[in-house]
């Protein structure tokens, strides 16, 4: 019980009035203020300095200081509890009046004390001015309220508690008592401190001897206190407004006057608008109407309203308004602006008069309730009006209100009694067995309602929805319309007045100014106080039909209702601003008649011009038309200023004026301090505990943790756990600190005006020094060092990387502009220089291409590189670091070998010593026991065995030495062939040398010293002499080649300039001879590894293996027999040769024979599709030499524009990279096509049983989708257009199917056969060929298709029913077939090839515009059709040209595609003709063709150049529209970073000359996202486009939502290609059945298409992961319901399957989404495989086969 009583007593004591009063009293006493500091000064210094003046004067000053301190505290305490005093002392004007004189007096007092000196009697203490000043000093400091720890919150809490507390006297007494005790406590503490100081003699002596004797210290101490007081007072003066009174609400009147002027201008221009009447609150803000022009208001309000009387009468001669105190201490705070609330609708913004913190009482439900959001103006008005209301009226109102309250209280008591009785009855009925029906509880709530009081004591109440007192001003919505009173009236109104809002909007008066506002009132707005109307209408005139829909807020439109006495209306006027403020963006967005100025301030910015369309036009006009008038030039300049595209650059500094209304008072920031150069977030010292400490000591902190935590306190575990968090925090702090420093540096350059000019010139000097002096000198020094160290120099690689480095001029914020053009006003605004692909000096270049992380950087003034502007310089990779790493590796290897050798040596010595001791012991035993009888059967067999072992050991050592010498001879012979095998041979020799040391004893080593000496000499010869000879030969060859290049280049240029049409044949032969010499030297240098293996196609390698002789195979054998190769690698190589059929396993162990063609044929016959006839083999062998010549010539060409990704990471030779001759682009596509073609056909050569074609599948077995790989390979594709897509070894991460649209022009629809006949019942030896049926008949050959190339057909070879398509599996009969080499796999993913074939046969199956998005081609445009026809004609003509014509045509304006085709075709034609025909015929034919074709080209080029000149302007504007329209979206933190990266890249590409190279590099490095950027089909001029559309550069993000359902619909449409929109031809189905050999389709199964088989290898992993984890989120994607439903319905209606089949198919399609094993898919697709074709080997089919019904 005692515990419970104590538990209940404690809250009562804590919440009691006495305890709360004591708490607030102590808090007011303990608030630290500057007066405490000066009190300590007075108590401390006066005792020491005034000893000579006497004790009485000392005590007087002390008493004056304490009394001033206590009096100031007491007045501040009273001001908390007394409102007028708090208002007087807490307002800014009070501080202005009190603080300024005090500061002046204190300043003069500390500076010149003779100012107050005068002759007076010192004995009279009243006249002593110092005592009064001490008292005034401590007293005034308290009144100024300059608190270090603010107490404004404390004052508010005290006032709230005073309002709520009942026993106020007890609260005041307790708080005063606590305050008094607190003051005494503070004074006693000061006294104790002073006494303790006096007792300490050391402190007292130092203070007296050193400080007080020095007069400078006393002066300095007084200055410190004075300056401290001055700073604190200035801090308080920061919230003081200017003491000059101005007119109230001057900014409102200015804005209204500006609005009226604008309306007058519009009326003068002929715009029919009415002047909008200013809507004002009738009950609030009387004084705000002083400067406004009042307008007439309708007389529809209550005549007896007091508020209306107060509005009509102006209060004059009010003493409190004229008084000075009222002017200074106005509680309404004149010139205080209201925050503008922007309204997006057409109406003016509402005046929100609610306050967050102001509270007052109001009467509701018979009680005084506290409102914390009471209107300030209403309470102020009540305070002003109370003194003017007579006392009798107040008593009468109170009596009436009490009488009403009594009735309300009586009803509530009655209701509570009823509820109590009902509750007791329910409790009693719970125990009864049967429940008794209880009466319903009727709870009545009585609240104040709004009603209309008539004289007949009848009150008409409003409904609850329309009553603002019940629902509040922001809760109810009123539907503006008619209230039907009865049925007849409603029917009559429906006939006479159209209730439909659309009809009403049409019939409204559109000439008035507020027509837009009338239209907007029909929309529902949440923050709108709507009116209500109750009236009876009897309209007979048709003219008034349009004026029935009433808006009660717009009172000026209701004047017509006064004519009718039957209309009664009750309305509430909403306070609105009479003007609409606009921002700067809204001012720009006006299409016609923009306003002169904006009203809301925007952020300060600097405009940077990015694109000027009229810049070039003005320069050309100035050259040609120099005689024009000056007026026209000025007009053009003004128009060009408007057409410029400008980006606003915002300075990186805080801007507190953003969003404020002009001519308004700024926010009152009372306790805000700005102590830094750049302070983004200004806040009060109240939040000091939440700030990060500026002065941190990380080293001392870490030292303290290491010493105390581990050794003293033993809390190492807790500190170790916190290290992870501290590291993350340190990283975050470092980033913030670096960003802050960067911004400070940038702002520091803006402080001085000349600094930007100096910095700009320094940056330009640094770019010149870096590009022209420093980097070339480093390259020269590096290569000279390599030559001196007998290494091959790397001039070409270094110069290539140096040329790749580009310096781009950027704006001050880092926005790239161009390489040559400077930004406008860059001297004053600043400039940045961005370096793309910065050069980094390397000791050697790696053989494998490495992706550099440093793609770009910025240049500093000191020539260093930084990642961000004004950032810290980054660490560049060291030149000597890789050299030192290699040396460290070698030293470590040598140490390891030395340790192993020492261990082996110790073991050998131990072994030899044991054998020696054993022999000696045996001899002693034999000598000592000679007389012992010999045991029969015992002989000295151990010695004989040892001798035999030693002999056998010597013989093995001799054989090994002989074998070593033979191998070393072979190594010396092949030394110049393979220079890079040196390390392997040396390692082999060292291993043999170690074996000899281990096995041979000490005596044997001495005997065999001659052999070791010979081996050592041979080693010196191989390592030093041969290497020097080889290096000299290489350097001389390089020098000779470089000189040859220069000579023949000069000859070639001379001949080309001399004869531009006819090229001399001798120069051509010379160049051919040079190429042969190059190939000969190159093959001699590198032998069989002469060319880059990465550039060879796999088809050529497979073909060359069986054609090579014994020597190459013997080299393979020697490689397999070497001891350095591990055994498991040998076995794998042998097994692979055995499986491929190149050689037998038995021959590998013995001697290899010459490989025959039969072995090659047997290997091909493993797959039945390669089982060819003898005639086909003969044709294949005949083309062998041509194929080999073409491939060799192809690889002799040097790679210039080929990307590093084409190497596929293969090993390169040292000299193969140093080639600079450009390779034709078409050869690259040949390689892609041949490699992909062979990879598809040979991917399953080892899995013979898995091949569908090589065997007959039994019934009931499913045919796998991936096994039937031949259907994915195009056999003969004749009608395709070659698009030059660069070869990319690594598949890109394609997320969306955005390729070119493919159009097929079908003249007549005829029966179309299938391309591939699949015979599943055939045996292994049966052959299945590719049947190339004539797919489309009766096609007009004169009209060219989009993807067609005219081919010179050979009727003898290309027969329609020929089956020789598989002969071209290596591309060796390309010349016979005369078809273009295409790469269809690059256009689509590998899995789309089969569907593409089906699409060509049946183009109506899949809508092409749904499957493949097309943004560049338009069928309706006739101009583009003519262009495509001209392109095709040019291509047909260019293929018949020779090599000389193609070189001449490269200088013309013809496009790049025709150039590459002509070069490729001409080279192949000329070489083949030279082999078959004689030289004379080729020369004559080429000359005749050249003369005829050049004239055609000149005519075509002239027509093309005219069209090109017309479209130059359009293409520039198209680039601008696509790339620069979204550049205004800078500064939005919610937007993605990838979008801004794309914009920066677009800015760079706009002014580059070679855009294609840079765009390809950006796309390959994935710096450029093609998904984000939009496209534009229509081309406009930029000024016209802006004028027509009225487009505004608004910083809004571009939101792109991926439509998941639409993507799924596309995939389903692809997967079900066997069904079409049209009726399926039955004959076509029968042919498929007969050809495929499928007698029973119901028993055969095929895998249904799974989503993972469609996308590319990288997209599969991402798509499968999204389906497994986020498939539920697809329900929220917005789709085109009309499109999806239409196509889906057509699909299912045309198919018409059974219900079960539909359900099974849907389950099968959705099966991956509901399997738990899909998590294994996520793990399975984590493998990173670059080749998408080989990725199918890793897939496992988890899905059940699906049966196809015919």
UniProtKB/Swiss-Prot annotation:
Per the record, where are the segments of Basic and acidic residues compositional bias?
260-277, 727-738, 1420-1512
- InterPro entries in alphabetical order: TIC214
Locations of Low complexity compositional bias? 617-629
Q: Which Pfam families match?
A: Ycf1
Q: Where in the cell is it found?
A: Plastid, Chloroplast inner membrane
Chain ranges passing through the membrane: 12-32, 69-89, 97-117, 129-149, 177-197, 216-236
Q: What domain of life does the UniProt record list for this protein's source?
A: Eukaryota
Membrane topology recorded in Swiss-Prot or TrEMBL: Multi-pass membrane protein
Region annotation (Disordered) ranges: 260-282, 617-638, 718-738, 1205-1225, 1419-1512
Listed A to Z, the keywords are:
Chloroplast, Membrane, Plastid, Plastid inner membrane, Protein transport, Transmembrane, Transmembrane helix, Transport
Q: Which GO terms describe its biological process?
A: protein transport
- Which cellular component terms (GO) are annotated to the entry? chloroplast inner membrane
Q: What does this protein do?
A: Involved in protein precursor import into chloroplasts. May be part of an intermediate translocation complex acting as a protein-conducting channel at the inner envelope.
Which protein family is named in the record? Belongs to the TIC214 family.
Subunit composition?
A: Part of the Tic complex.
Q: Name the chain's protein.
A: Protein TIC 214
> Which species is this record about?
Cuscuta reflexa
Q: What is the lineage of its organism?
A: Eukaryota, Viridiplantae, Streptophyta, Embryophyta, Tracheophyta
């Amino acid at each position: 019980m005692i515990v419970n009583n104590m538990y209940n007593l404690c809250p009562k004591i804590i919440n009691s009035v006495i305890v709360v009063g004591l708490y607030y009293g102590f808090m007011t006493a303990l608030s630290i203020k500057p007066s405490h500091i000066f009190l300590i000064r007075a108590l401390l210094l006066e005792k020491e300095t005034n000893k000579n003046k006497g004790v009485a004067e000392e005590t007087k000053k002390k008493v004056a200081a304490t009394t001033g301190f206590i009096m100031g505290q007491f007045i501040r305490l009273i001001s908390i509890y007394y409102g007028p005093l708090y208002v007087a002392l807490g307002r800014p004007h009070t501080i202005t009046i009190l603080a300024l004189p005090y500061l002046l007096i204190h300043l003069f007092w500390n500076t010149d004390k003779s100012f107050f000196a005068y002759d007076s009697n010192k004995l009279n203490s009243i006249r002593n001015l110092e005592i009064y000043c001490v008292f005034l000093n401590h007293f005034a400091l308290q009144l100024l309220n300059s608190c270090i720890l603010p107490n404004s919150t404390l004052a508010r809490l005290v006032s709230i508690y005073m309002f709520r507390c009942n026993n106020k006297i007890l609260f005041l007494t307790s708080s005063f008592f606590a305050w008094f005790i607190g003051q005494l406590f503070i004074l006693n503490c000061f006294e104790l401190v002073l006494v303790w100081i006096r007792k300490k003699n050391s402190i007292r002596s130092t203070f007296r001897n050193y400080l007080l004797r020095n007069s400078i210290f006393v002066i300095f101490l007084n200055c410190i206190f004075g300056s401290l007081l001055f700073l604190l007072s200035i801090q308080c003066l920061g919230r003081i407004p200017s003491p000059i009174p101005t007119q109230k609400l001057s900014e409102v009147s200015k804005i209204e006057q500006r609005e009226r002027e604008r309306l007058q201008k519009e009326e003068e221009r002929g715009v029919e608008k009415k002047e909008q009447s200013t809507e004002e609150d009738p009950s609030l803000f009387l004084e705000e109407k002083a400067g406004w022009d009042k307008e007439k208001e309708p007389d529809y309000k209550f005549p007896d309203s007091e508020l209306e009387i107060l509005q009509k009468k102006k209060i004059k001669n009010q003493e409190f308004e004229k008084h000075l105190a009222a002017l200074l201490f106005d509680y309404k705070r004149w010139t205080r602006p209201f925050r503008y609330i922007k309204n997006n609708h057409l109406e003016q913004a509402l005046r929100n008069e609610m306050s967050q913190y102001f509270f007052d009482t109001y009467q509701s439900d018979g009680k005084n309730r506290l409102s914390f959001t009471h209107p300030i103006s209403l309470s102020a008005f009540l305070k002003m009006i109370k003194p003017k209301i007579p006392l009798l009226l107040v008593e009468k109102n109170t009596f009436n209100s009490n009488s009403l309250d009594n009735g309300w209280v009586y009803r509530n008591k009655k209701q509570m009694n009823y509820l109590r009785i009902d509750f007791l009855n329910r409790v009693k009925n719970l125990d009864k067995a049967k429940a008794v029906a209880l009466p319903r509880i009727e709870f009545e709530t009585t609240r104040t309602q709004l009603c209309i009081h008539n004289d007949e004591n009848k009150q008409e109440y409003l409904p609850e929805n329309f009553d603002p007192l019940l629902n509040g001003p922001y809760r109810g919505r009123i539907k503006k319309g008619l209230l039907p009173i009865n049925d007849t009236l409603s029917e009559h109104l429906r006939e006479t007045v159209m209730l439909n809002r659309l009809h009403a909007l049409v019939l409204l008066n559109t000439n008035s100014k507020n027509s837009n506002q009338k239209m907007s009132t029909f929309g529902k707005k949440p923050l709108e106080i709507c009116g209500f109307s109750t009236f009876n209408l009897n309209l007979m005139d048709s003219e008034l039909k349009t004026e029935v829909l009433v808006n009660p807020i717009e009172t000026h439109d209701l004047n017509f209702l006064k004519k009718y006495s039957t209309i009664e209306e009750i309305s509430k006027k909403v306070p609105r601003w009479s003007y609409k403020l606009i921002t700067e963006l809204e001012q720009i967005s006006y299409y016609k008649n923009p306003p002169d100025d904006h009203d809301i301030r925007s952020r300060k910015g600097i405009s940077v011009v990015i694109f000027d369309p009229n810049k070039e036009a003005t320069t050309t006009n100035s050259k040609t038309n120099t005689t024009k008038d000056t007026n026209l030039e000025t007009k053009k300049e003004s128009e060009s200023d408007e057409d410029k595209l400008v980006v606003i650059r915002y300075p990186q500094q805080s801007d507190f004026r953003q969003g404020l209304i002009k001519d308004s008072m700024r926010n009152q920031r009372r306790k805000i301090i700005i102590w830094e150069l750049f302070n983004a977030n200004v806040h009060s010292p109240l939040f000091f505990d939440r700030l990060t400490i500026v002065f941190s000591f990380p080293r001392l902190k870490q030292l303290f943790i290491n010493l105390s935590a581990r050794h003293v306190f033993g809390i190492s575990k807790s500190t170790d756990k916190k290290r992870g968090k501290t590291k993350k925090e340190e990283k975050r702090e470092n980033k913030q600190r670096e960003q802050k420093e960067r911004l400070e540096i940038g702002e520091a350059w803006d402080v001085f005006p000349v600094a930007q000019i100096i910095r700009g010139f320094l940056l330009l000097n640094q770019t010149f020094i870096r590009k022209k002096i420093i980097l070339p000198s480093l390259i020269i020094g590096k290569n000279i060092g390599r030559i001196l160290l007998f290494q091959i120099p790397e001039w070409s690689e270094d110069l290539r990387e140096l040329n790749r480095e580009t310096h781009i001029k950027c704006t001050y914020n880092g926005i790239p502009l161009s390489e040559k053009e400077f930004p406008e006003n860059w001297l004053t605004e600043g400039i940045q220089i961005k370096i793309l692909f910065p050069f980094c000096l390397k000791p050697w270049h790696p053989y494998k291409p490495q992706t550099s992380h440093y793609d770009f950087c910025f240049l500093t003034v000191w020539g260093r590189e930084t990642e961000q502007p004004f950032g810290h310089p980054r660490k560049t990779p060291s030149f000597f670091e890789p050299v030192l790493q290699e040396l460290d590796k070698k030293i470590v290897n040598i140490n390891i070998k030395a340790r192993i050798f020492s261990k082996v040596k110790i073991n050998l010595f131990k072994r030899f010593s044991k054998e020696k001791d054993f022999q000696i012991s045996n001899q002693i035993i034999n000598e000592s026991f000679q007389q012992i009888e010999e045991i029969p059967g015992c002989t000295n067999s151990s010695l004989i065995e040892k001798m035999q072992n030693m002999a056998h050991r010597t013989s093995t050592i001799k054989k090994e030495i002989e074998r070593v010498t033979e191998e070393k001879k072979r190594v010396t012979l092949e030394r110049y062939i393979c220079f890079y095998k040196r390390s392997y041979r040396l390692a082999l020799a060292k291993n043999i040398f170690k074996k000899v040391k281990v096995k041979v004893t000490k005596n044997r080593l001495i005997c065999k010293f001659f052999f070791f000496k010979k081996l050592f000499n041979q080693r010196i010869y191989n390592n030093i002499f041969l290497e020097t000879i080889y290096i000299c030969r290489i350097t001389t060859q390089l020098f000779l080649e470089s000189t040859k290049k220069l000579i023949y280049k000069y000859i070639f240029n001379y001949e080309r300039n001399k004869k531009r049409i006819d090229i001399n044949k001798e120069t051509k032969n010379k160049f051919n001879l040079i190429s042969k010499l190059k190939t000969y030297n190159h093959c001699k240098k590198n032998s069989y590894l002469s060319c880059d293996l990465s550039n060879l196609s796999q088809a050529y390698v497979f073909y060359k293996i069986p054609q090579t002789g014994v020597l190459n195979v013997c080299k393979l054998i020697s490689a397999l027999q070497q001891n350095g190769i591990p055994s498991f690698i040998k076995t794998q190589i042998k097994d692979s040769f055995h499986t491929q059929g190149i050689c037998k396993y038995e021959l590998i162990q013995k001697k290899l024979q010459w490989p025959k063609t039969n072995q090659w044929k047997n290997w091909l016959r493993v797959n039945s599709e390669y089982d060819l006839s003898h005639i086909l083999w003969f044709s294949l062998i005949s083309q062998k030499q041509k194929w080999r010549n073409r491939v060799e010539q192809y690889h002799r060409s040097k790679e210039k524009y080929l990307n590093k990704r084409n190497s596929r990471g293969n090993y390169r030779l040292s000299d193969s990279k140093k080639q600079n001759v450009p390779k034709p682009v078409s050869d690259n596509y040949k390689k892609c096509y041949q490699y992909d073609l062979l990879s598809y056909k040979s991917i399953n050569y080892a899995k013979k049983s898995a091949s569908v074609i090589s065997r007959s599948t039994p019934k009931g077995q499913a045919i796998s989708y991936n096994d039937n790989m031949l259907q994915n390979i195009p056999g003969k594709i004749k009608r395709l257009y070659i698009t030059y897509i660069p070869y990319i070894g690594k598949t890109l991460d394609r997320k969306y199917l955005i390729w070119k649209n493919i159009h097929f022009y079908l003249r007549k629809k005829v029966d179309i056969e299938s391309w591939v006949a699949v015979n599943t019942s055939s045996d292994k030896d049966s052959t299945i060929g590719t049947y190339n049926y004539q797919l489309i008949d009766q096609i007009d050959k004169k009209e060219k298709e989009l993807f067609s190339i005219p081919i010179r057909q050979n009727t003898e070879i290309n027969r329609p029913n020929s089956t020789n398509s598989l002969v071209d599996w290596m591309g060796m009969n390309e010349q016979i077939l005369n078809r273009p080499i295409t790469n269809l796999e690059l256009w689509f993913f590998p899995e789309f090839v089969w569907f593409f074939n089906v699409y060509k046969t049946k183009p109506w199956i899949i809508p092409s515009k749904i499957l493949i998005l097309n943004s560049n081609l338009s069928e309706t445009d006739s101009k583009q059709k003519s262009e495509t026809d001209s392109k095709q004609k040019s291509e047909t003509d260019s293929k018949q040209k020779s090599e000389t014509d193609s070189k001449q045509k490269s200088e013309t304006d013809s496009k790049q595609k025709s150039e590459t085709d002509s070069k490729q075709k001409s080279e192949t034609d000329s070489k083949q003709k030279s082999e078959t025909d004689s030289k004379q015929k080729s020369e004559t034919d080429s000359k005749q063709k050249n003369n005829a074709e050049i004239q055609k080209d000149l005519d075509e080029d002239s027509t093309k150049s005219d069209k090109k000149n017309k479209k130059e302007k359009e293409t520039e504007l198209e680039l601008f529209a696509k790339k620069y329209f979204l550049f205004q979206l800078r500064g939005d933190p919610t937007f993605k970073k990838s979008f801004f990266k794309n914009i920066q890249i677009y800015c760079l590409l706009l002014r580059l000359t070679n855009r294609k190279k840079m765009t390809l590099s950006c796309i390959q490095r994935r710096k450029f996202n093609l998904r984000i950027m939009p496209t534009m089909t229509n081309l406009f001029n930029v000024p016209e486009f802006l004028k027509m559309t009225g487009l505004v550069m608004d910083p809004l993000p571009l939101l792109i939502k991926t439509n998941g359902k639409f993507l799924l619909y596309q995939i389903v449409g692809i997967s079900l290609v066997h069904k079409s929109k049209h009726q399926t031809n039955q004959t076509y189905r029968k042919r498929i059945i007969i050809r495929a050999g499928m007698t029973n389709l119901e028993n055969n199964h095929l895998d249904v298409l799974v989503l993972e088989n469609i996308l590319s290898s990288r997209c599969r992993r991402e798509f499968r992961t999204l389906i497994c984890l986020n498939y539920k989120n697809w329900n929220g994607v917005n789709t085109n319901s009309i499109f999806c439903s239409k196509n889906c319905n057509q699909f299912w209606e045309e198919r018409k399957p059974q219900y079960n089949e539909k359900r099974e198919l849907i389950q099968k399609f959705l099966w991956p989404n509901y399997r738990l094993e899909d998590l294994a898919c996520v793990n399975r697709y984590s493998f990173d495989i670059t080749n998408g074709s080989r990725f199918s080997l890793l897939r496992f089919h988890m899905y059940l086969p699906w049966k196809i019904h015919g």
